[in-house]
Amino acid sequence: MYRYNILLVIFFLTSCSNLLFVPVKSYPLTPDAADILYEDIYLTVDDGVTIHGWKMLADKNKIGTIVFFHGNGDNVSTQMPNTFWLAKEGYDMYVFDYREYGQSQGKANLDATISDMELMIGYIAERLPDEEKMIVMGHSLGGSMAVYVVAHSAFRDKIESLITVEAFSDYHEITQEVLSKSWLMWAFQWPLKFAIDNSYRPLDSIGLISPIPVAIIHSDVDEIIGMHHARDLFEAATEPKSLIVIDSNHSNVFVTKDNRQILFDYLKTLKR
């Protein structure tokens, strides 16, 4: 049994970087199911890999532009319940799949995904009118990665706000918390958490985002990422910043009218 446990730890240590990503390929929905006009986007990144995304066109007089980064077990299609309604409210919505997700090529890993997200932001920035900025929004892992990307982006002058939704504050901490809930992996939570790359730790970057406004949206009943992550991020952030507490499970955040209105109320506070 001891030998088996050691082999199990070695296996997870060699593959832990991929624990962050659970690629989803299938598309249950496309924007036309919600009567939204959209365009397919294909970006070729530095190493020749092609990344796929959608631009959902504002359904009424355009208010602004949002780029949305999904979590680790989703793709642009499965996250449509959290995004399509913003196009209905007047936002051009850009959504992209990470490597290995949806129609995107390549193999998912943290370094490449962080780099690809910056390229996606640059793609949008180059197409915005001079007077317009984009809002960067990320859910779960997408929000945590977006903290680092926005803090270090070469396109900060084109970013109006960062909005994180159910994001975590530390890669080591969330890894330990997730493993601690598994009877099989409970005993290995301490060594395995250090196998995850923490170079892009959100707590180290969120204080660098100012003067770009940051909104941290989190449910106090999130069953996967605890509310303490949001509080830690809020404490580490510098003004202007907002902590917005909602009532939701982890995934289906904006399926309710109340939570949609909460987000829309924040969006209305941003200067145009």
For each of these PLM feature ranges, what is it?
Residues 83-105:
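Conserved alpha/beta-hydrolase
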Residues 108-128:
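Alpha/beta-hydrolase active-site loop
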Residues 209-210, 215-218, 222:
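Short beta-strand/loop motif that positions the catalytic acidic residue
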Residues 148-204, 255:
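Hydrolase active-site cap/lid region
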Residues 128-140:
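Alpha/beta-hydrolase fold nucleophile elbow
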Residues 82, 202, 226-235:
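Short alpha-helix in the alpha/beta-hydrolase fold that links the catalytic acid
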Residues 12-45, 49-54:
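An N-terminal hydrophobic leader/cap segment in hydrolases
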Residues 249-258:
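Catalytic histidine-centered segment of alpha/beta-hydrolase-like enzymes
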